[in-house]
From Swiss-Prot:
Pfam families listed in its UniProt record: YidD
Protein's UniProt name: Putative membrane protein insertion efficiency factor
Source organism of this protein record: Carboxydothermus hydrogenoformans (strain ATCC BAA-161 / DSM 6008 / Z-2901)
Transmembrane residue ranges: none
Topology in membrane: Peripheral membrane protein
């Protein structure tokens, strides 16, 4: 399942995003952020982080550098 979703994101990045243009206000872009989040945390939590990020990406936000959060070590 993870590989399929990551493949769909890559498809979007390679073929759809160039047509729509660069609209993301953040670095890394929302699609790259979601890709990295799914790689790091898995499909469920990574998708959750990606959706939260996409909802924050609008004309009224300043944007800027917003990396995927690091995994916290458990004690």
């Amino acid at each position: 399942m993870r590989k399929i979703i990551l493949l769909l994101i890559r498809f979007y990045q390679k073929f759809v995003s160039p047509i729509l243009g660069s609209n993301c206000r953040f670095y890394p872009s929302c699609s790259q952020y979601t890709y990295e989040a799914i790689e790091r945390y898995g499909v469920i939590y990574g998708s959750y982080l990606g959706i939260k990020r996409i909802l924050r990406c609008h004309p009224f936000t300043p944007g800027g550098y917003d990396p995927v959060p690091e995994k916290k070590l458990r004690r």
